[in-house]
Structure formats: structure tokens, C-alpha cells
Amino acid sequence: YTFEPTGESIPYAIFVPSSYDPKGTEALPLLVSLHGLGRSYDWLMGYHGLLDQAEESGYAVVTPLGYIREGWFGSRPAEDPQDGVYSEQDVMNVLELVRDELRIDSDRIFLWGHSMGGGGTYHIAAKHPDVFAGLGVAAPAPAISAPMDEILDKIAHLPIFILQGDQDDLVPVFATRTWVAGMAARGMQHLYVEIEGGDHSLLISQDAANMQKFVDFFNIVGQK
């Protein structure tokens, strides 16, 4: 699509389950999925189990670029500060495009991300706290766009699933434990799974069982 602030063409990828009938009435739940630093817009589509599980549970999946590969979705300063603003804006633009194109259940829009995308999940949910029904983060690079307490206060009403490996060499496990402690202190509905021996990337990108944990969590919190 054309990104209006710059006139650039920005890609995104979308998966639609085979159960969706364009002429029907049933609305789809949606997984807005945010990639890690330096990855392409469709990188998450290759994560083991994601599309199979989305097909089985009837989810649409969309993977925005975030304007550039290193935009941090606004959660941290990009090399050009304007890129961070555009990175967040691209995600919200793509969400609206999908909602215009498909029948999306507004009560079952979930936001999740891996690494940089985890930080982006924290940031975007805090900026748009009434859009999403639940959150998920895997090995999340802590958002620094605002103090942790300020971000958690804004998302305290949202259920969140957190996946972290204790041998992560990019996002130290203690950093994620600190955020989880903040969630617990607020009485947030959260589920924290710490993987013994888990690394930064393969614990989610190449592990369908861990990917299933996210989908299962969203299935539960999205029940009507």
C-alpha cells in the first residue's frame, strides 16, 4: 500500500484461513504479528506452526513491516527519530487496511511480537490500549519509549502471554522477569512461561509447540 507521509510503497503479508467466506457473516479473529530487528515484513509467516495453527483455529494473520526493518515499532529510538513514528503508524495503517478488507471481530484482535516486535507490542498496546483484546511477547526487547511502570499501567487491563528462554543472550531473562513482576504487582491477567535452556530465536521461530502456546492463550482469552 502507499504510505501517505512519504509516498512509499510499504509491503505487508496476510494469511486468511480457508474457513473464511467473503460472502458470509462470520467475523475473523486477527493476529497482528511484529517481527524482530532487521527481519522482513513476512518473516514471521515462516515460524513453525503459526499458519497451521491459525488455519486450525480460524485466525487471520497479518505481518506489517513497521515502515523499515529497524524501526522498533516506536518502542525505541530508530536511527532517524521519524522512522520510529512511521514504524508505529505503519502497523496501525495495516490493521485498518485488513479491517477494511476482511470481516474482523473487533473483540478478538490480538497483538504479539518477537524480540524487537515484543517491545513494539508493549509500546503499541500502551499507545492504543482499547484496540487489542490480548497481547503476547516472545523474548521481548524491553520498550524504552516510556518507563516500564507507565507502559504497564496503560495495558494493565489486557491479558498477556510471555515466553522467555533462560539462556537468551540478547534479551536477558532477568529483564523479562522484571516486567513480569510488574504485571503480577498490578494483578494483571498474565501467563509467563520460562523455557529452561531456551535461546533468543529458536524457542519460538522453530518450535511449533511454543507457538501453539500463544494461539491457545488467545483462544482462551478471546472466548465469548
Give names to the regions the model predicted.
Residues 9-11, 27-103:
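Serine-hydrolase catalytic machinery in alpha/beta-hydrolase-like enzymes
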Residues 161-163, 169-224:
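C-terminal catalytic histidine-bearing segment of alpha/beta-hydrolase fold enzymes
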Residues 155-160:
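Short, proline-enriched alpha-helix->beta-strand connector loops that line the catalytic pocket
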Residues 18, 37, 65-68, 141, ...:
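Short beta-to-alpha linker loops that shape the active-site pocket of alpha/beta-hydrolase fold enzymes
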Residues 46, 99-100, 107-154:
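Primarily recognizes the serine-hydrolase "nucleophile elbow" in alpha/beta-hydrolase
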Residues 1-24:
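N-terminal cap/lid segment of alpha/beta-hydrolase-fold proteins
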Residues 25-28, 44, 81-89, 126, ...:
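Soluble non-cytosolic domains of exported or imported proteins
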Residues 32-36, 139, 164:
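The conserved beta1-alpha1 loop
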